[in-house]
């Protein structure tokens, strides 16, 4: 197992995320009929009930909180049904202990891949030294900071097309922040040297948690 264990699963738009000892069925995402700010038209709601997830798509805002009793992994957020090399501006109040990420999150259709641009996290760094199965790919400088880049391969794991083998691409900001603009194209261009494609599935500004305690209120534009 890599990144502790596997969690996953949607038919149209999946979540396959690293978690600690957890597997579960995902809640369905939702396309929004009336787009919010920045053309936001997508709600990511994977096990959002575990984090008391609430959102206002027209305002581009959402919030959640979780405790040590969190019984699995949840990934929630707002964004776009089709990803792009766009600049995503966000602001948040995000605090977390244990396993949690504040990140741009999405999927590529072909070659199939899952990706994270991690802006802040709890105590678990997915590109940290000594992580089993991780390939370090150096660093990329973007938006005034250096990000550590790594990749991992998932073998026969749940994905946006069912069970498959795919790569995870990670950029982890070395100096955490909870607001700013993420120029996703800088990361995509760097990852492309290592096989990252441009056939985009969904893309969201997300909060994920799978252990510890925390809370977040996020605005996306």
UniProtKB/Swiss-Prot annotation:
The gene is xynI. It comes from the Eukaryota. Its EC number is 3.2.1.8. Endo-1,4-beta-xylanase involved in the hydrolysis of xylan, a major structural heterogeneous polysaccharide found in plant biomass representing the second most abundant polysaccharide in the biosphere, after cellulose. Hydrolyzes xylans from oat spelt and birchwood at similar rates, but it has no detectable activity toward Avicel or carboxymethyl cellulose. The keyword Signal applies. Belongs to the glycosyl hydrolase 11 (cellulase G) family. The keyword rRNA processing does not apply. GO terms for cellular component: extracellular region. Residues 1-22 form the signal peptide. This is Endo-1,4-beta-xylanase 1. The active site is at 114 (nucleophile), 208 (proton donor). Its main location: secreted. GO terms for biological process: xylan catabolic process. Optimum pH is 2.0. It is an enzyme of class 3 (hydrolase). Residues 29-221 form the GH11 domain. It is found in: Secreted. One of its GO terms (molecular function) is endo-1,4-beta-xylanase activity. Pathway: Glycan degradation; xylan degradation. Optimum temperature is 50 degrees Celsius. Keywords: Carbohydrate metabolism, Glycosidase, Hydrolase, Polysaccharide degradation, Secreted, Signal, Xylan degradation. It catalyses: Endohydrolysis of (1->4)-beta-D-xylosidic linkages in xylans.
